[in-house]
Amino acid sequence: MTTKKLKKLLALYLPYLLLGLVATNFGEAWRLAEGKELGERIMSMMGTIPMAFANPLPSLHPLDLLVGLCCGAGLRLAVYLRGKNAKKYRHGMEYGSARWGSAKDIEPFMAPKFSDNIILTKTERLMMSNRPPDPKNARNKNVLVVGGSGSGKTRFWLKPNLLQCHSSYVVTDPKGTIVLECGQAMLKNGYKVKVLNTINFKKSMHYNPFAYVHSEKDILKLVTTLMTNTKGEGSGGDPFWEKSERLLLTALIAYLHYEAPVEEQNFATLLEMLNTMQVLEDDEEYQNPVDLLFEELAKKKPNSFAGRQYKLYKLAAGKTAKSILISCGARLAPFDIQELRDLTMYDELQLDTLGDKKTALFLIMSDTDSTFNFLISMVYTQLFNLLCDKADDVYGGKLPIHVRCLIDECANIGQIPNLEKLVATIRSREISACLVLQARSQLKAIYKDNADTIVGNMDSQIFLGGSEPTTLKDLSEMLGKETIDAFNTSDTRGNSPSYGTTFQKMGHELLSRDELAVLDGGKCILQLRGVRPFLSDKYDLTQHPNYKLTSDYDPKNTFDIEKYLNRKEKIHPGDEFIVVDADSLPSA
């Protein structure tokens, strides 16, 4: 038995033990009393009680101890029976116990130093540490932010958290305004800034998904992401075509990864291979240049991954193979744009280094045209996989620098494969995902049945305002009901007029759907797992210590993307480089 349990038992039974010891003296008084009749003995006992209590110590006579035992046990039994049969009252909570959280409720979850926190509202914050002094206060850093258009998702929540500068950040930037307003602040706080711009490719760093392919598993992940986010509207139907496309793309990408020079491992080469894959419907024996490449590969490496996948694709007849090629060509049509080919020619983002040093990666996308948003989804998919693998293989389970993904307009970037599993596992690797939506129904539309799993792994949920019915209904139910007092009056008029008043208790939603729909524009609702909800003011960006470094404060702080991308890299003391002799490299 542990010391804690022993103390608990002692505290529970000590009163009954003390009563039993005192009762031994009454037992002694009864034993010393004279008389044969009960009344005589009771009268005599009045004179023996002072004698029995003359000695403050309990009597150890067997009969006296028996009296004490019976008294102590009898009282314990009476207390037990009363408690067992007692009516269960919850005064003031008959119809619900919901209430708003207070400063005392959030205090255990906040770090003393302001910069070591995630900003949730004006008065509530969440410590970045995954190991608080009391383990029961540990919460993951995933956040779900829901707010209609104009509710301040970017100004009141995303920007203040970006300016905290305690982690590496991956920021989805619709319209490209966040990097302009906060980029200079990140540079002045020692960050390396990187930009992927799918609106203006000329103002973007290069991103090549092939640069992060290191194994057959990575090839399959890349193909899955590409297939998931490039299927057009109403592309349902026979899954045969999609599976056939997957086989062909897997074979070609695997060939490029294992057989082609590094400079040819990109989407431009992949498209060139597809363009040379002519199929003659009336000549099954015809071999195009790609067929010849794989035939040569089969001779050198009979069991290669690329060869096996291509062999399965070649089982299709000529007409079927032609249809598969047309489908693949349509899927990769965006890469026919020369600017996009140039963008994906090589890689500058270095996604696998975000957990090594403080970096701010801005992913600029259009909020009106989703043509190139699949690139953003590919970045996130590869980012999560790369960082999780690096945390496990290099850093013993967690990254030295926490990586926060602030995914604004989450519904517009497409589907991130296996997001429901990722949000449940990235916490231990020092990675967090913050999803910003206009309505919860957006998440349901993209992730279907997995949407609830994703929401369930968000320990912090913030509602900034909105009028979407599903969101309001779910939120009102989650807030629960409180018990209120109702005052009714009755006035009966007639031959015998009467007037009466009644008081009663009833349940009422903490905030009903209509009340949520007209929530004050300066207010927000925070729900932190295991804590009462908070009705608080939104955080005021102008009060942030780093606000003066933004272009909101001074237009001179506007970040010039073009100038930054064209800068010359400076060499600093302590920088490490790998020197390679160009003459020793194998020729292409």
PLM ranges: what are they?
Residues 1-151, 155-158, 202, 481, ...:
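Basic- and hydrophobic-enriched, low-structure N-terminal and domain-boundary segments
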Residues 4, 72, 78, 242, ...:
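General helical secondary-structure elements
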Residues 21-24, 28, 134-431, 446, ...:
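P-loop NTPase motor domains
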Residues 94-100, 125, 141-142, 308, ...:
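General secondary-structure edge motif
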Residues 114-120, 374-382, 475:
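Conserved long hydrophobic alpha-helices within structured protein cores
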Residues 423-525:
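Conserved ATP-driven motor cores of ASCE-family P-loop NTPases powering translocation/secretion/packaging/pilus
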